[in-house]
Amino acid sequence: MKQFISEAEPDRNGTLTLTGKAFTYLRKVRRMREGDSLPVLLPGGRSVMMGADRIDDGKREIRLRLQTVPQQDENIAATATVESPAAAQTEIILLQWILKGAKTDTIVRQAAEAGVHIIVPVIGEFSVARKQNPAQQERFRRIIKEARQQSGSPIDTRITEPAPLSAVMQHTVPPLLGSGTVCGMCSEAAGTALSVHTFLAAKPARIMLAIGAEGGISPAETTMLAAAGFKTIHFNTNVLRAETAALYAVAAMQTIRNEADQWQLPASIS
């Protein structure tokens, strides 16, 4: 279900007064009218229903008010909350090599829609776009917010500053490792790579996934990842473009992990 992500909590009267980009989104994109309601995700992570009780197009201002539901005691009303989607069985951290043009923007949007927890942009040896625009990070955050509003994702997807793999492995990755974490790097070559089911056989609580750029992951980067415990994963399908591989991999990991209780590897493999 689509949602609006609020940067502020309602006031003591249960209202939010919105202007600027928030007004534009609700009025022009969502086409809200007085009396309409929608789910609002608050800063603390709670999702509530709010209705538009006043719209001033002249001032470009819209006021939302918490909706209530009657309780058994007619003198008491409770805030109408929104049931969140079923929680994912695992967290996904995506180490995504920077791609050329707007392809990285596409991956960021799709990852946020799919509920990836953390996106780590990597400036790889084969990355064509090595110089980063200072405004890029703010654009990424805006893309993530728009994607979460469109998809209704309750996951507060975060994105780190783009950095070379050496810096990522030194500063970003270590705090995210721990028991219940599995790390994999995707490869178009089968070789001795693991199947996805084998990779996820232990039902990990966290998956760290590395996806290369247009030219893949360099030999030096592969060695660095392998030394950190990353296993090579291969999808038994066609050769995928880098921007396709990211969504394909995330979807495969989520589906297999979320449905882990419905399949089982032979004991000799697991």
Each predicted region: which residue ranges?
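Active-site/ligand-binding-proximal alpha/beta "capping" segment
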Residues: 175-224, 230-234
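Structured adenosyl-cofactor binding patch, chiefly the S-adenosyl-L-methionine
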Residues: 219-270
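RNA substrate-binding interface of SAM-dependent RNA methyltransferases
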Residues: 74-184
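Fold-independent oxyanion-binding glycine-rich loops
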Residues: 7-8, 20-21, 43, 97-98, ...
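N-terminal positively charged helical leader segments and presequences
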Residues: 1-83
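Short, ordered loop/turn segments at secondary-structure junctions
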Residues: 69, 123-127, 237-238
